[in-house]
Amino acid sequence: MSCLNLHVPKNPVGKYIPLVVLLQMYIIYVEPYYGLHYFESVRQFLGPKILYGTVYFLVICHSIESAIAFLLCLKKGLPFCSSMKWIVSTFIFGGPTLAMLNKQKKHIA
């Protein structure tokens, strides 16, 4: 079961960032599809290009950070399960997890 535990940044604010991203995804994709209008003013104020652009930008940035985490795991010689935890955690939380991985010593899972 230890293979399923993710490496979470120690910064408590970093734990809530995925919730903000999920709220943004809800505002962009789910709410208009079901005809709900709770966040209509936010969509009108920011516009669809900015909302879609930030999602695409974040996905690209986190993908690049995950690729860097993959290379760091290869360089450190970490086992597959531990490497996958670091890569998924870096994709979700971004830079703070990548900084934690960079500080880890060689062969530490």
Curated annotation (Swiss-Prot):
InterPro entries: TMEM254. Signal peptide: none annotated. It is found in: Membrane. The keyword Acetylation does not apply. Keywords: Membrane, Transmembrane, Transmembrane helix. It is a multi-pass membrane protein. GO terms for cellular component: membrane. The chain crosses the membrane at residues 16-36, 54-74, 80-100. It comes from the Eukaryota. This is Uncharacterized membrane protein C688.16.
